[in-house]
Regions:
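Serine/threonine-rich, low-complexity linker/repeat segments that form flexible spacers/stalks
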Residues: 1-35, 139-166
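Short beta-strand elements of extracellular/lumenal beta-sandwich folds
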Residues: 17-43, 159-195, 200
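Serine/threonine-enriched low-complexity regions used as flexible
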Residues: 32, 101-144
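Short, acidic/polar linear motifs in exposed loop/turn regions
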Residues: 36-41, 51, 104-106, 119, ...
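A surface/secretory-pathway sequence property marking extracellular, secreted
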Residues: 43-90, 215-242
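Enriched for extracellular/lumenal, surface-exposed ectodomains of secreted and cell-surface proteins
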Residues: 51, 86, 113-122, 265
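Low-complexity, intrinsically disordered segments enriched in Ser/Thr together with acidic residues
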Residues: 85-108
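Surface-exposed interaction regions enriched in Ser/Thr/Asp/Glu
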Residues: 235-266
């Protein structure tokens, strides 16, 4: 039996034809995790995405997209909508993702996929699918607890909170500590991030004081841990008046709650 989790961004960023400036296209992830929750091996599994539907924000027109690359785990799988997962052992999972970009800003409205597997299992592939769930993707992150691998994981929204879906088939709640966190300027143009020490996974999203004009290059925790590059980032969102809001994000686990955020001007 297979559980399929899809991870779709809501917004994709490219040029907005209704603004005078030309905005750059930003690559985004369309992700899938295939978890074999049964007792038998799922042999020679392939997933082929249908053409995702991405519409332009203003007029609802379909937008073309470019596939920059496909991946199964960390292995490059070409630039097509087909991903070959091979065999998936019982009680294990594999991660797939497509890296894409569009020329225009827009949003995802629809995504479908089809599946092929070896006949040795018998029956149509749909008979093997226990559950299909689609999630709003926040970011590719990396769970770095002991025993984890070096494959990126999916941080997704769930109601008012978050969950992280890891490459070994687990999914766990993520505490949203944005409401208890603070950012303060320190020497060298850097920022001090503080929130309560927490066991478990945490995600913090706070307004970026530099409004996207500086680059976040390093995050250091008070106990000496240097966060992986996957686990801190900057984001932006378009407001109804066409202005932008800018944010700083940190994802971590079992944390002291005290960090130094190191910025660069370029």
């Amino acid at each position: 039996l297979l559980r399929l989790d899809y991870f779709l961004p809501t917004d994709v960023f490219g040029d907005d034809p209704f603004t005078p400036e030309t905005e750059a296209s930003e690559p985004f992830t369309l992700g899938v995790r295939v978890a074999n929750v049964g007792a038998g091996t799922a042999a020679k599994l392939q997933i082929e995405s249908a053409q995702p539907k991405i519409v332009e924000n203003r007029q609802g027109l379909l937008i073309d997209f470019t596939i920059l690359g496909g991946y199964v785990g960390n292995a490059i799988a070409g630039k097509s909508l087909l991903l070959d997962f091979g065999d998936i052992a019982p009680q294990s999972a594999k991660m797939g993702r497509w890296l894409m970009q569009t020329t225009l800003a827009g949003r995802f409205t629809q995504f479908n996929a089809s599946f092929v597997h070896a006949d040795s299992l018998g029956g149509a592939v749909t008979s093997l699918i226990k559950e299909i769930v689609t999630h709003k993707l926040v970011r590719d992150v990396r769970v770095d607890l002991p025993g984890q691998d070096d494959i990126d994981d999916f941080l997704a929204e769930q109601g008012d909170g978050y969950r992280v879906y890891d490459s070994q088939g687990g999914d766990n709640p993520v505490f949203n500590l944005s409401g208890t966190a603070s950012l303060n300027a320190v020497s060298g143009g850097n920022l001090a991030l503080q929130f309560p020490a927490t066991q478990g996974y945490v995600h913090v999203k706070l307004p970026d004081p530099s409004r996207g004009s500086r680059v976040l290059v390093q995050v250091l925790r008070s106990d000496g841990k240097q966060l992986l590059a996957q686990n801190f980032w900057l984001s932006k969102s378009r407001n109804s008046d066409l202005s932008w809001s800018y944010y700083v994000h940190v994802f971590d686990s079992n944390t002291t709650g005290q960090y130094t955020l190191v910025f660069s001007d370029s």
